[in-house]
Amino acid sequence: RFFDDNQSINTASGADTYGDNPRLYHGGDFAGVTAKLDYLQDLGVNTIWITPIVENVKGVAVTDEGKEDVPYNAAYHGYWASDFTKLNPTMGTTEEFKTMISEAHKRGMRIMVDIVVNHAGYGTESTFADMLRDKSVSEGDIKSWQSGLPDFATENADVRAKLVEWQTSWMRNYGVDYFRVDTVKHVDSTTWAALKNSTTEVNPSFKMIGEYYGAGYASNGSTLGSGQMDADLDFDFNDQATSFVSGNISSVEKFLSARNSALNNTYMTGQFLSSHDEDGFKAALMNGKKYTEDEATSAALVAATLQLTAKGIPVIYYGEEVGLSGLNNYPYQTNRYDMDFSKATKDNVTYQHYKNLLSIRNAYTDVFARGSRTVVASSDEEGYDVVSRSYGGTTLYVGMNIKDTAKEVKVPVSLAAGTEVKDLYSGATYTVGSDKTVAVTIPAAKDGGTVILTEVKKTKDPGKTDPTPEKVSATSITLDKKTAGKQQNDTKKAAPKSGDDNEAATYVCLLGLAMVAITAATYRKKRACN
C-alpha cells in the first residue's frame, strides 16, 4: 500500500479484487516503488523489502471460517501463490520489475523479495497435486495444512528441489538481492539449508532474513548459525522498546547487553517496532496503555532511537517514519494503511527524526552494527539512559530521555579534559570537564529525546573538525500493496558485496506492494495471510 503508479493493472486479478475494503488490492506496484526510490534514498534506507511477487489466486473468497462479519479476501498480501514462476499481474510487468531493480541498484539500494516455501494458495490442490502432503495427516508446525492452505511436502527431495529452483530463479533471472523468508518454523531445516546453499551458489553475498514467529536472539529454532538463515526477525525487540519507554530502562539494558554480545555476522536479528503482523508501536501504546496521541508520538521517537542505535538490522515499517500507525485488529487491520507522503515534511518531527538517525547510523555503520554496548549513565526514576557504542577506536555516546522535559546529565567519557565533543543529532558542541565528564542536555522526548556524542578530532585543516565516518552505506525500508527529506549523507555507492553486509544493512518494512499482515494472536490459529 505504498504507491499506485500504474493504475491500469489494479484489477488484473479480477474486478472485485480492488477497492477500499482492507482485504482487497489497493494498487501498490513495481512502478510505484521505482517512482519513490528517491524518497527512500533521501530517507536513508538501503534495502527495500517488498511482499511476495509471484502470481496469486484470482478473485475473492471467504476463507475465515465463513464468518459474516469478515470481509471478502483477495490475495492482496501475496501469500496465496498459484504460479511460482510468474509475476503477479497486479504488481506490474516484467519490464517494470526489472526497472525497479536496476534503478534501485543505481542508487546503491537492494531489493529484498518476500518468499513462501511452505504453502500455496487456496484452490490450487490440482495444480500442485504431486507436491502436497496428505491433508488428513496433521503433525505439528511442519506437517499440517496451516489455515487450510495447501502444504508442500518439503521433506520430499523432488518437491524441495522444485521449490528451491522456483525461488532462486528470481535471483538468476532478475538480480534480486535478498529474500525475506516466510513461515520459517513451518518448514524443515533441511529445506532451508538447501535453499541457503543454492542461493550462495548463485550469489555468495546473498542474504536471507527469516520470519520464525516469536524468534529473538536467545530463541530462534536453531535457524541461526546453522547454515539456514543469515538473520531472523526479532520478535522480542518491540516488547523491550515498550518497556524502555515505560521506564524500565535498567532491565531493558540488561537485555540489550546480552543481545549485543550474542549477535555477530552469522547470527543476526532484525529489530522492528511495527509490522504487518503486529500492532503499530504508537497504536499499541494508545490502545493498550491509554497514551494520548502526543504521548505515544513522543515515546515512539525515543523507541526509534533505541532501535536505530542498537546492534542488529533495523526494520522500519512503511509509514512509521512519518508517524503512521495502526492496530492489527483482524480482520480489518488498521495497521495496513495506505502510505501518506504528504506527511513527509520539514515540520514533521518524526520524519526528521528518522532521517537524522539514519544519516548518523549510515555514517557510523561499524560502530552501530558491530560495536560494544556499555551503560555509562542511567536512571529508571529520572527516565534517561546513556550508553557508549565503541568499535575500532571510535566511540559514540547515545543518550535517550523518555520524559516530557529536557534532562541535564553529566556523561562520563573516556576523553581528556578540554576535549571538544559534538552532538551529531543537534549539532551542539560541548567540552569535557576536568572530571572527565560532559554536561549535556538531552531534549524532551517530544523533541526527539536524543543526543549522540562524538569526539571532534582536530585536523590539519582548521575548517574541517568533524570526524570522518568510517563507512557509509545506505539504510532500508519495506513496502505494502496500495498506495501507498533529503538524506544528510548524499554519498551514493554500489550495493556492498562484502560478507559483512549482514551486519551493516538496514531493512525497512514498508510493505510496498501487496500487503502482508495478520495479528499475532491470529497467527497462532491460522495462516490465512502469512
Regions found by a protein language model. Give the residues of each.
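Solvent-exposed loop/turn segments at secondary-structure junctions
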Residues: 1-4, 54-57, 117-122, 184-187, ...
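Conserved, mostly hydrophobic/aromatic
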Residues: 40, 50, 84, 104, ...
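Active-site-proximal helices and loops of the catalytic beta/alpha 8
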Residues: 165-179, 183-272, 286-289, 295-297, ...
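Short strand-edge motifs at loop-to-beta-strand transitions and within beta-strands
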Residues: 438-440
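Cytoplasmic C-terminal tails of single-pass
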Residues: 528-530
